[in-house]
Amino acid sequence: MPDDVVIRTEKLSRTFSHGGSQQHVLRNLDLEVERGSFTVIMGPSGAGKSTLLYALSGLDRPSLGRVVVDGVDISRLGEDALARFRRDHCGFVFQQVHLLDQLSVIDNLMAVGLLVERSRARVRERCDRLLDLVGLPEADRGKYPAMLSGGEAQRVGIARALVGRPAAVFADEPTGQLNSRYSGMILDLLGRVHAEGQTIVMVTHDLRSALRGSRILYLRDGRIRGELDLGERRGPGGGRVGGGGDDPDGAVDPDGADAPAAPDDAARTTALTAFLAEMGW
């Protein structure tokens, strides 16, 4: 697999059996995801979006075909090896953030980091840097999950997804249960993470969320019906725009304000709207 491709599928199919009938959710998908890209999967309800995300990340197994992630054919791994691969190579962001209630914020991240790194000091340094990145103050890092707002918990969830330096982060409707304030904050954060070179694959039905992507895949009836290359969001200087404008070192605004619009946002919106209309969305 070329170095610039981090995920590849070959004839990927997923079929579920219900009683005496079969439901073909994914049908012979050939797909490549470039390293460092922000790929967005869209489509109507029941199109197979989440099923595809789970197959790409090893949370589900294909009925037929292959899934190769970071050079490893995960469709051939046994259960234990697949679990280790997910732990070491994949980060996950879901609508519901499943933090361990009995552990503080920092210990939730440390528990993940110590699975892949032996040095407690190095893990703590990385966890603190990631919590700085997502804008969670030091005073809040000793809190327990029950003490966090929905937006704070999602920020911690994204930081936790990055602790193990994953080959890709997989996000399934990450703003689906957040209000507009926190949704904007999480989108800014994902943009920041992508601007630093992280590969992201995200499922969404939301136009504003999709605009953060560099590539849009439209799924319907288990097949990729169309693809749109939006390219990277660019600032006035031509650099990637993440969650904090053109400042590459700034953290996401903890108050949840949207990042400044990139000069090409209007053109991107027009292109995406036209594409979705063509797809019958």
Task: Give, region by region, the residue ranges found by the protein language model.
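Conserved ABC ATPase "signature" region
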Residues: V72-D73, A121-A139
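Helix-to-loop junction immediately C-terminal to a conserved catalytic motif
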Residues: S57
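Catalytic Walker B motif of ABC-type/P-loop ATPase nucleotide-binding domains
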Residues: V169-D172
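Conserved ABC ATPase signature
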Residues: Y144-L148, E152-Q154
